[in-house]
Amino acid sequence: MNAKQTQIMGGGGRDEDNAEDSAQASGQVQINTEGVDSLLDEIDGLLENNAEEFVRSYVQKGGE
């Protein structure tokens, strides 16, 4: 999967304060997106190797 970047724009207030807040928020979103992409890649790899065992490990007995 490709890493995606998300840009967050703030509204209202002084431009100087918003520019700093937007830069911090944007960086945090990028870090979280990369972590999610990494996790999804790991899950895809497990499913390719043995999907049935992967599903069994998360399904409770009795259909609960």
From Swiss-Prot:
Keywords from the UniProt entry: Isopeptide bond, Ubl conjugation pathway
Spans annotated as Disordered: 1-32
InterPro entries found in the cross-reference section: Ubiquitin-like_Pup
Pathway: Protein degradation; proteasomal Pup-dependent pathway
Subunit organization: Strongly interacts with the proteasome-associated ATPase ARC through a hydrophobic interface; the interacting region of Pup lies in its C-terminal half. There is one Pup binding site per ARC hexamer ring. Interacts with the Pup--protein ligase PafA and with the depupylase Dop via its C-terminal half.
Function of the protein: Protein modifier that is covalently attached to lysine residues of substrate proteins, thereby targeting them for proteasomal degradation. The tagging system is termed pupylation.
ARC ATPase binding: annotated segments: 20-58
UniProt record similarity statement: Belongs to the prokaryotic ubiquitin-like protein family.
Domain remark in the UniProt entry: The N-terminal unstructured half of Pup provides a signal required to initiate unfolding and degradation by the proteasome but is not needed for pupylation, while the C-terminal helical half of Pup interacts with ARC to target proteins to the proteasome. The C-terminal 26 residues of PuP also interact with PafA and Dop.
GO biological process per UniProt: modification-dependent protein catabolic process; proteasomal protein catabolic process; protein pupylation
Record-given protein name: Prokaryotic ubiquitin-like protein Pup
GO molecular function annotation: proteasome binding; protein tag activity
Pfam families: Pup
